[in-house]
Structure formats: C-alpha cells, structure tokens
Amino acid sequence: MEQLMSLFPAISTLFTQDPVISITRIALIIFGFFLSYFGFKRTLEPLIMVPMGLGMIAINAGVLFLEAGVVGTIHLDPLVSEPSVLVNLMQVNWLQPVYNFTFSNGLIACIVFFGIGAMSDISFILIRPWASIIVALFAEMGTFATLIIGIKMGLLPNEAAAVATIGGADGPMVLFASLILAKDLFVPIAIIAYLYLSLTYAGYPYLIKLLVPKKYRGLEVEMDFPEVSQRSKFVFSVLACMLLCLLLPVASPLILSFFLGIAIKEAQIEPFQNLLETTLTYGSTLFLGLLLGALCEAKTILDPKISLIVVLGITALLISGIGGVLGGWIVYWFSKGKFNPVIGIAGVSCLPTTAKIAQKTVTEENPYAVILPLAMGAGVCGLIVSAIATGVFISTLFLLN
C-alpha cells in the first residue's frame, strides 16, 4: 500500500486529506476543464480562461506529500510571508517568483495597463466627452451600490470597498485595489473578479436584450466626426496623467501605466508600441490567467467569506451593467435619438470585451450599424472613472483610519 502511495501520491492524497478538501479538489479539476473548454469554444474569454482552467486543474491534481508528511504542491503558496521560508520556496515552487515579483505587488496589473493604454483610442472621448462621461458614471453604479451592500452584510469597510471594485469590471484595477485595501482577501477577490469578468462575455448580451428593445438595438449612429490630431491626444494624455496623479496619488501607478501607453501610441514610438501591444500585453495576460488558476486551491476556495464575495461580485457587475445601459438611454434621450443605448454597456470598462459585446449585439439586428469606435470611447472613459473611484475609496479609507 505504501508503495502505491509513493507511486501515485496525487491520488493517495485524495484519501488522506479531509474529505471536504478532497471533494473540492475534484470539483475544481472538473470546473477547470470546463473553463478551458469554454475558452476554446469562445463562449468565455479564451485569453484568460484557457490558462486559468489548466492552472486550476494542475494545482488541484498535482498535490503530493512534502517534507514531514505535509500535503502541498510545487507550484505556488500565496500565503507565505516569512522571508526565510519564502526564499526557500522560490527554489522549489516554479511559479513562486512570478507571483511574488509581479502579482503580489501589483506589477502585473500595471503591465496590463501599459498594453491597454497602447491599444486605446481616445479620439471619441475628446469628440463627444459628455456622452462618454455620462455612460461611464452610470456604469459605476454597481461599485458604489456594492460598497453599501457589503458593509450592510457584515464586511469591514476596506473589505467591502475591495469587493465593490469588481463592479468597475476592470481586472487589473481589482487586483491593485484588493492588494491595498484587503490583502487577506486578495486571492479570493482576484479569482472571483476574473471569473466573473469572463462570464460577462456570455451574460451581458442577454442583459442588453432585456433592457434595450429590438427596434432600438439596430440604431445607426452618426460616425462623421472631426478628426482629432495626434498632438491633441498626446497633450490630453500627459495633462490627464498629471491631474489624476495629483488628485489620486494612491492610484498613480495604474494611472501612469495607462496614460504612458496612450502617449507612446500617439507619439508613434513604434518599438515601444509593438512591445506593449504584443509581447508585454499577451505575456502578462498568459501569466495572469495561469496564476489565477494556480491560486484556486481547495483550501482557498473553502474560505467562509468566499460565498459572500461571490454574491457581491455578481451583484456589482449586474448593477453596473444596468447602470451603463441606463446611461446609454439618457444620452439617447438627450441626443434626440442620435445615440444607440446599447453603447451604454461598454461603460463597464472590461476593455475591449464590453465594446465588442455591444457591437456584436447591434450587428445581429443591423449588419450595417457601426458603433465600435463610440463603444471603445465609452470603455476608455469607464476605465478612467473606475481608476478615480478606486483612488477615492483608498484615499477615503486611509483618511478614516
């Protein structure tokens, strides 16, 4: 029997661990398979779901007996903080250096923001600023509503604020905020945030169809806008970066990363732009998905606060989606029907996913209607508003403490 346990330690641990943990491991292995498969089918976002699903499978399947009979893996241990233990683990766990040097300090979030900035077009923010701002503000409804609900449900203000940032649908922002506001809940918040952000890919089209009648979904919008010069966009990015860093220094790492990406694009520094748009963006997204999957250990998922975060996370994204579409309707009414209310969903700043969802939903009703540029503008504005909301949360809580 001992020889069999030595030959197949991963299977053996299923019988030696607490039955609840063993069952959870099996459930997570199955769940990881479905995440990766639905990523393959493009039902969910493949860039995150395929590596996340495989990471989830490996971390829960590849459990073995370590020193002194301790059960664990040689992938990653996010709970270690003792320096001497951490140094030893970095020589054993292959993902430990990646986690500690890029994930737990928010660096990976900043790298992703570099790429988002380099791929963002701010022309439509400058051409129609009020339309983008109104949509973006309403799309933050979920963030502020969930903060209040979270506190009412027993979370501490800092914990509720960290969970509430899921409502902005901005993954890197959620990582950054939860690290500062609620480090002990960082892992479950990050996992749930990215799971839900990928689920918006599948769920938001139904929300749009529920809130926007068919005859309005195919509305064409005027696309004959004046051209915005690269100089104007460059100057805007520099001034916006300066102003937001002055007002919200706690969020300045993400603000700098995003606007530097825009500035590099508008200055046409092609070597940097190619680096940010391809190598850094896709490399960081790969490790982000893989690490999120590797963090889905059974012990982590069994945290009693997980169920509350699950409920609050989906509440935040649902209210934000409703708020965004409501903002779209308000702009439609004020513009006397010259704005497609579906664009409102793009104010939920999961770039570029929500903008693509908006365009796809409109195309189903009218193949000739093009709203993607306006939707991207609303999404970029939503990202900026999300950064402001996060900065306000962090600054206010620091002041209260």
From Swiss-Prot:
<comment type="function">
    <text>Beta subunit of the biotin-dependent malonate decarboxylase multienzyme complex (EC 7.2.4.4). Acts as an integral membrane-bound carboxybiotin protein decarboxylase by releasing the carboxyl group of the carboxylated biotin carrier MADF. The free energy of the decarboxylation reaction is used to pump Na(+) out of the cell.</text>
</comment>
<dbReference type="Pfam" id="PF03977">
    <property type="entry name" value="OAD_beta"/>
</dbReference>
<feature type="transmembrane region" description="Helical">
    <location>
        <begin position="306"/>
        <end position="326"/>
    </location>
</feature>
<feature type="transmembrane region" description="Helical">
    <location>
        <begin position="70"/>
        <end position="90"/>
    </location>
</feature>
<feature type="transmembrane region" description="Helical">
    <location>
        <begin position="20"/>
        <end position="40"/>
    </location>
</feature>
<feature type="transmembrane region" description="Helical">
    <location>
        <begin position="131"/>
        <end position="151"/>
    </location>
</feature>
<feature type="transmembrane region" description="Helical">
    <location>
        <begin position="107"/>
        <end position="127"/>
    </location>
</feature>
<protein>
    <recommendedName>
        <fullName>Carboxybiotin decarboxylase</fullName>
        <ecNumber>7.2.4.1</ecNumber>
    </recommendedName>
</protein>
<keyword id="KW-1003">Cell membrane</keyword>
<dbReference type="GO" id="GO:0006814">
    <property type="term" value="P:sodium ion transport"/>
</dbReference>
<dbReference type="InterPro" id="IPR017558">
    <property type="entry name" value="Malonate_biotin"/>
</dbReference>
<feature type="transmembrane region" description="Helical">
    <location>
        <begin position="244"/>
        <end position="264"/>
    </location>
</feature>
<dbReference type="GO" id="GO:0016829">
    <property type="term" value="F:lyase activity"/>
</dbReference>
<keyword id="KW-0472">Membrane</keyword>
<feature type="transmembrane region" description="Helical">
    <location>
        <begin position="380"/>
        <end position="400"/>
    </location>
</feature>
<feature type="transmembrane region" description="Helical">
    <location>
        <begin position="173"/>
        <end position="193"/>
    </location>
</feature>
<feature type="transmembrane region" description="Helical">
    <location>
        <begin position="46"/>
        <end position="66"/>
    </location>
</feature>
<feature type="transmembrane region" description="Helical">
    <location>
        <begin position="275"/>
        <end position="295"/>
    </location>
</feature>
<dbReference type="GO" id="GO:0015451">
    <property type="term" value="F:decarboxylation-driven active transmembrane transporter activity"/>
</dbReference>
<keyword id="KW-1133">Transmembrane helix</keyword>
<keyword id="KW-0812">Transmembrane</keyword>
<dbReference type="InterPro" id="IPR005661">
    <property type="entry name" value="OadB_MmdB"/>
</dbReference>
<keyword id="KW-1278">Translocase</keyword>
<dbReference type="GO" id="GO:0005886">
    <property type="term" value="C:plasma membrane"/>
</dbReference>
